[in-house]
Amino acid sequence: MSHRKFSAPRHGSLGFLPRKRSSRHRGKVKSFPKDDSSKPVHLTAFLGYKAGMTHIVREVDRPGSKVNKKEVVEAVTIVETPPMVIVGIVGYVETPRGLRTFKTIFAEHISDECKRRFYKNWHKSKKKAFTKYCKKWQDADGKKQLERDFSSMKKYCQVIRVIAHTQMRLLPLRQKKAHLMEVQVNGGTVAEKLDWARERLEQQVPVSQVFGQDEMIDVIGVTKGKGYKGVTSRWHTKKLPRKTHRGLRKVACIGAWHPARVAFSVARAGQKGYHHRTEINKKIYKIGQGYLIKDGKLIKNNASTDYDLSDKSINPLGGFVHYGEVTNDFVMLKGCVVGTKKRVLTLRKSLLVQTKRRALEKIDLKFIDTTSKFGHGRFQTVEEKKAFMGPLKKDRIAKEEGA
């Protein structure tokens, strides 16, 4: 510490080294929850897309606390989660060196958005992926082989996972290539898992079948990229005094003369952001239903509550900034999550047994804010804005042109 007579803790954690750009854009599940055969068969993870943030008002249910039975305002994140399609089954056997893939079976029909994932350039390709494989499901020899594969998986496998992909055409994004991932199937016996997965081949699985209201989940994703940053921004080291020669936002001493190299633990400039991160214990405040047609009418009121009966959708006025409108099922999570808008996020069931009172608290939303997130929004719905503003000039011009 040079001539200082006191020490200080180091700046920045060494637990996240190396701080470099993530090799994958989609968050990777490095461990799934522990299997419990006494529970019914269920999936353990799901993919969603970050739409944006808003705030809610709710009444706290925490007896003995100072805020019990009082209203609190909390920030929430909206993650759009259209149903995922199951297109494959993978069986694993446990070996002394860990899990090993035993067999992989794909469905007969696979959509183009999923096939795009197997090509670097879909436009220039011959688009022949799985054409030979899908014939297995049609001829007699192929069917016999598939039956043998299923029976051998029941006999030898200990872990069953399904291959599922997202439906990009349902989202307000330009990307056409679906995100594909393996999701572990937990609960029941291996035979029950395999039967469950086989029944759902080529079927859609909604998020409501994976997660429940008030559940604590983990969010895995890649953080927002910041580019190449200096040492003060990247490691939050202290700025040097004003009169320092050759810059202030630096580290004055980067180590001793010997060993004659800079240690890995010394804060240096470099990449900041776009790192792979897993955040645990995010509470689900609401699992919302997407737009649906009932009796020939489009039902959008997925942001109404027992206290706020106004007919409004979860979308703020003008849509979510840099995202658009959420028209599919969505998950409302407490607080913030990693990544930028439109970023794909992996939602995973918690690995822990939740015992804390905050984790088990029942959430009853009183109000969901839907004002415009582009500036200082004042109105919750379009009708409220029209009632306050009165007839606008553009309305009068349109009326005159119509007449």
Curated annotation (Swiss-Prot):
Major localization listed first in the record, in broad terms: nucleus
Cross-link (Glycyl lysine isopeptide (Lys-Gly) (interchain with G-Cter in SUMO2)): 39, 224, 226, 286, 366, 386, 393, 399
Record keywords, A-Z: Acetylation, Cytoplasm, Isopeptide bond, Methylation, Nucleus, Phosphoprotein, Ribonucleoprotein, Ribosomal protein, Ubl conjugation
Reported modifications of this chain: Constitutively monomethylated at His-245 by METTL18. Methylation at His-245 regulates translation elongation by slowing ribosome traversal on tyrosine codons: slower elongation provides enough time for proper folding of synthesized proteins and prevents cellular aggregation of tyrosine-rich proteins It is not required for incorporation of RPL3 into ribosomes.
Subcellular location: Nucleus, Nucleolus; Cytoplasm
Keyword DNA-binding recorded: no
Any one GO BP annotation for this protein: translation
Region listing for Disordered, in residue ranges: 1-38
Composition bias type Basic residues, residue spans: 18-31
Superkingdom, natural source: Eukaryota
Positions carrying Tele-methylhistidine: 245
GO cellular component: cytosolic large ribosomal subunit; nucleolus
Record PTM N6-acetyllysine, positions in chain: 136, 286, 294, 366, 373
UniProt xrefs under Pfam families: Ribosomal_L3 (PF00297)
Keyword Transport annotated: no
Entry-annotated residues carrying Phosphoserine: 13, 304
Gene Ontology terms, MF aspect: RNA binding; structural constituent of ribosome
Crosslink position(s): Glycyl lysine isopeptide (Lys-Gly) (interchain with G-Cter in SUMO1): 294
PANTHER family found in the cross-reference section: 60S RIBOSOMAL PROTEIN L3-RELATED, LARGE RIBOSOMAL SUBUNIT PROTEIN UL3
Subunit structure: Component of the large ribosomal subunit. Interacts with DHX33.
Protein family (similarity comment): Belongs to the universal ribosomal protein uL3 family.
Annotated function: Component of the large ribosomal subunit. The ribosome is a large ribonucleoprotein complex responsible for the synthesis of proteins in the cell.
Protein name stated in the entry: Large ribosomal subunit protein uL3
Organism for this UniProt entry: Bos taurus
